[in-house]
Amino acid sequence: MKLSRRSFMKANAVAAAAAAAGLSVPGVARAVVGQQEAIKWDKAPCRFCGTGCGVLVGTQQGRVVACQGDPDAPVNRGLNCIKGYFLPKIMYGKDRLTQPLLRMKNGKYDKEGEFTPITWDQAFDVMEEKFKTALKEKGPESIGMFGSGQWTIWEGYAASKLFKAGFRSNNIDPNARHCMASAVVGFMRTFGMDEPMGCYDDIEQADAFVLWGANMAEMHPILWSRITNRRLSNQNVTVAVLSTYQHRSFELADNGIIFTPQSDLVILNYIANYIIQNNAINQDFFSKHVNLRKGATDIGYGLRPTHPLEKAAKNPGSDASEPMSFEDYKAFVAEYTLEKTAEMTGVPKDQLEQLAQLYADPNKKVISYWTMGFNQHTRGVWANNLVYNLHLLTGKISQPGCGPFSLTGQPSACGTAREVGTFAHRLPADMVVTNEKHRDICEKKWNIPSGTIPAKIGLHAVAQDRALKDGKLNVYWTMCTNNMQAGPNINEERMPGWRDPRNFIIVSDPYPTVSALAADLILPTAMWVEKEGAYGNAERRTQFWRQQVQAPGEAKSDLWQLVQFSRRFKTEEVWPEDLLAKKPELRGKTLYEVLYATPEVSKFPVSELAEDQLNDESRELGFYLQKGLFEEYAWFGRGHGHDLAPFDDYHKARGLRWPVVNGKETQWRYSEGNDPYVKAGEGYKFYGKPDGKAVIFALPFEPAAEAPDEEYDLWLSTGRVLEHWHTGSMTRRVPELHRAFPEAVLFIHPLDAKARDLRRGDKVKVVSRRGEVISIVETRGRNRPPQGLVYMPFFDAAQLVNKLTLDATDPLSKETDFKKCAVKLEKV
């Protein structure tokens, strides 16, 4: 190959960057460097985590052949993590699904049959029959959908409309229930609005970083690179890391803290006590912008009502609270002394004091980061509320360089699951189904009869499993998620319902995942840049991308599937007569006509697309579907502090952080001069609350739902590793990533292994009260648990660690605690 000087320099740059990242350059990328003229490049956000890195996607001859960090992307500034560099390969696994597959025997659907290729029409025929039968015989509560924080914004919006408005069922929930629900409820309780007030620009201005249950070095490596740069370039910057086991983020920590599982609640209250005792309250901020409330306690563990722990709870599921005085709050946290905290947590006193001093020092700008260690917690909402307390006591919030920041794990857990409102209780822009006014706003905008959207909260993720097992939920469609592997308590609460002959399970996915193979019908699905999309990341940044290639075979996007399936239903088949009587003009129309092909949605012509621009859905339907859905959805938040920019602006920009008012994005919410909703002279205004004040909650320590005992003598914590993402359904199909971490292992303290006659590399049976798996002993490596705790990642389909986990949830958020259950080990 003959290279120009420019191409030669680019080739060297690629090789150098790859070497610095510890990578070999994929052969296809090597070839690409010298063939720039043949490659078409376009922008997109990364397909993986909630950081929202920008990438440049290289396509050639209808395939994605290369990917590089986008130097113009403000999030990552041209840098990718190891997963981002291999994005092209996630799309071309050898087992990519290209046609619908139905379990059949003797030419007909059979629950025990073999997967057999069928057409899309045949697939929709079977689905139509199953949905209509369930709706007719048992009503809207017998059908459900499990969606995703990986849906595009308009896919989530279309799904929510179809179920909540079309089928009149709120039984739709996203997999973000398993990762971000506690953050959502925490934000709503404290501030009255969801999502962080700060942004990534805080990193370069902060004096201290505190990680609560967040291994950012592996789970948010690009943000970690920015924190590392800040720490190493300024000797006065401090990093504290709190976890139940030692991981890679500890390598940068000035104060690395290992605490007993569940006792983070104790540490949080101790710091609040320290702030008060040392007169470190920002009195001006506190007196003007904060209310105090005492929350209900002994609220249970989100288990089945028949479980002994639920029967014993005095206030199961209670979100109640009552006003309290400062003196009462001071007395409440005073119980969390240094001595008591050290005893309950196992953390040395000097480390606790160092941590508390960071928050108490008025000259230190502090950012608190957290992810699943806080959220996947039976008191996850409380943990979120308690960390907000520290920032509200000190006034370290809504200003550059300081604030509490909940990091998301999925690319659009914020933009789709939360902002669109695909949770069983939510509607767009923080509205909820239980509020009559909110339902009325949606019904009027959607031009459907008053009373169409049910007021009853639908089934959340874990409740869906239980309802399937109990035969109450009979038709279940999952999209863009692998919950059979990712959800808790597989043996007792999920697999029985999926394989129950009363139930029909549909899985839409690009690959034959554990979930797909447990289903009755598999729908082949387009992924990432095989469709036009939009994600919303952790810092409220909404990012768009164009369709850049076509999906293989007959694979179709989730949006196409939802919209085309809606054609199978007429209003009189899904709505009662009293609703139809309110809008007789809708009688005889299909849900496609009522929900999607409306004047509001269909008013943008396909001619707005460039002549050579791919957009399979819009060109098939004859109007710009994505733009119509987005503009209708964006209407709900404009003028209400959730303002999104016009559709076309996002295709021009590298994302914009809402609220976007008069073309300007917002970096810091709730503070004067930064937020357009805070007027001059107000200073701060937490306008999600009627009085503009945030809430400090008094909430105590309460124990975990399950803890080690004489028989099951170890804590088990589960999570991720750098090389793989969630269940590995994409990353394990990338040879380089698979080789880097080919199978899950059980990380264990060497002394715990020795006490059980186990050595590194031994096979071991990990047993809980719910199931067992075989894994490999690892006494070294990146994760170093303390004695009494073992850690196991969940990416490996051959080691389904969620056979072990308990389906205990936070009673307020309904989010599962994947970090704490009890296990024992048996040598194999």
Curated annotation (Swiss-Prot):
Keywords: 4Fe-4S, Electron transport, Iron, Iron-sulfur, Metal-binding, Molybdenum, Nitrate assimilation, Oxidoreductase, Periplasm, Signal, Transport. Substrate binds at residue 794. Exported by the Tat system. The position of the signal peptide cleavage has been experimentally proven. Its main location: periplasm. Changing residue 6 to Q: Impairs interaction with NapD. Lack of nitrate reductase activity. Tat transport is blocked. The keyword rRNA processing does not apply. Residues 39-95 form the 4Fe-4S Mo/W bis-MGD-type domain. Interaction in the cytoplasm with the NapD chaperone prevents premature export. One of its GO terms (molecular function) is nitrate reductase activity. Catalytic subunit of the periplasmic nitrate reductase complex NapAB. Receives electrons from NapB and catalyzes the reduction of nitrate to nitrite. This is Periplasmic nitrate reductase. It comes from Escherichia coli (strain K12). The gene is napA.
